[in-house]
Amino acid sequence: MKNLSVIIQARMGSHRLPGKILKKIANNSLLDWVIKRVKKSKKIKKIILATTKNEKDDILQEIASRNKIFFFRGQNQDVLGRFYKAAKTHGAEVVVRVCADNPFIDRKLIDLLIEKFKSKKYDYICNHQNRLNSKYADGFGAEIFSLELLQKLFNNAKKKAQREHVTQYVWDNKKKFRILALQAPKSLAYPSLKFDINTLKDLNYIKKFVRANKISLLSTASDIVKYKLKENKPKEVKL
């Protein structure tokens, strides 16, 4: 697949936990966890960190440089516009979108999205746990689509929510697009589990969880779910 890129969406100005992407989890910042785990994908050649022009985000350019990935800065509020221009500027024809608050993003799940997209049967594919009952635990999510689709969103999305959330227009107009939500395998079908970081409570929990289970950049999504199940036994979803 030509000109395939991952775009990681990141900024310092989180409302609930400002600066969370630089918070340390073991020996890496949250953002470093995301970047380094994405880099383990066997199918990704280019990674782009997309952030804002706010001076608070200057440090993210340094992080991108240190990790030897590409960088783009755009408008703060128009996240869709920033995302589209990042893809356009760096010549991406197919984009995998990853959020910077998911430290356990799994390269195997990213590679699976890419393989499914190669069929050209779908405009948009995701593994979000809250989308079309895909049943994935929360925190492994990513989505894939073409630059052509992204341009349609950029040109047609008018509502505030559609500019703030990159693919909201797709979900508001589901009948216009060929959508696939990948179904979780049995080992990951625990939608009640949560691994993303939005609050200080989330961060403190993940720090303890990583330390207690010696989780590393090589730990898989299946490993992480197994460790979590040792703590508590959530109801498994029947497939």
Ranges and model annotations:
Residues T199:
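Short, conserved phosphate/pyrophosphate- and ester-handling motifs at nucleotide-, phospho-/glycolipid
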Residues K53-K120:
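Short phosphate-binding loop-to-helix
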Residues M1-L17:
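N-terminal nucleotide-binding beta1-loop-alpha1 segment
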Residues N3-I8, L31, K46-L49:
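Hydrophobic targeting segments
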Residues I105-L193, N204, K208, D223-L239:
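Conserved core of the sugar-phosphate nucleotidyltransferase
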Residues L30-I47, L60, R66-N67:
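A short, N-terminal amphipathic alpha-helix
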Residues K46, F70, R178-L180:
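Conserved beta-strand segments of alpha/beta enzyme cores
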